[in-house]
Swiss-Prot record:
Protein name in UniProt: Uncharacterized protein YGL041W-A, mitochondrial
Entry GO terms, CC: mitochondrion
The keyword Transit peptide is annotated on this UniProt entry: yes
Cellular location(s): Mitochondrion
Transit peptide: 1-42
Domain of life: Eukaryota
UniProt keyword list: Mitochondrion, Transit peptide
Keyword Transit peptide recorded: yes
Length: 154
């Protein structure tokens, strides 16, 4: 038996009981509604006239991550870099840096760049990006730094 309840107006609530009906067919058809779209929309500003740099950065990073996720070999190299950083306690599992803050201090950046295993993994990641045709230049790094909260303050 399936009971469906909906609110008709502010005071009236309606319900209906359906019996002897296969509910799996009905629930399956509800999942395939054509008007549901998986697209994301971001607000620019209250009047949609002023651009929002942080939202633009998130959109650009999402496109980059979609490209990386679509290529398993690139994703594998990125996970290797991530695992090395976690194993060596350069970052925490929750995404913050090892000093419990969201920003990295200069000595942490030096420590990351001096680590031989991490440098090797980053080179492999860079080569795999180039093989796959994914560009990772200043146009992508600036939005990535903004999303990670590492951009320079103006």
């Amino acid at each position: 038996m399936l009971r469906v309840i909906w609110k008709h107006s502010s005071r009236v609530t309606r319900s209906i009981e359906l019996s002897n009906i296969s509910t799996t067919n009905h629930t399956r058809s509800l999942r395939r509604l054509s008007w549901i779209s998986p697209r994301r929309f971001y607000a620019q500003s209250w009047d949609d006239r002023q651009p929002n740099d942080k939202i633009d950065a998130h959109i650009k990073v999402q496109k980059l991550m979609d490209q990386i996720n679509s290529r398993p070999n690139v994703l594998e190299k990125l996970e290797k870099v991530s695992n090395i950083m976690i194993e060596k306690k350069l970052v925490n599992l929750d995404g913050t840096s090892a000093n419990e803050e969201n920003t990295m201090k200069p000595w942490q950046m030096i420590k990351i760049l001096m680590d031989r295993d991490l440098r090797h993994a980053m080179k492999e990641f860079k080569l795999e990006l180039e093989k796959s045709g994914i560009q990772l230049g200043p146009e992508q790094l600036a939005p990535l730094m903004t999303v990670l909260g590492l951009e320079k303050k103006k």
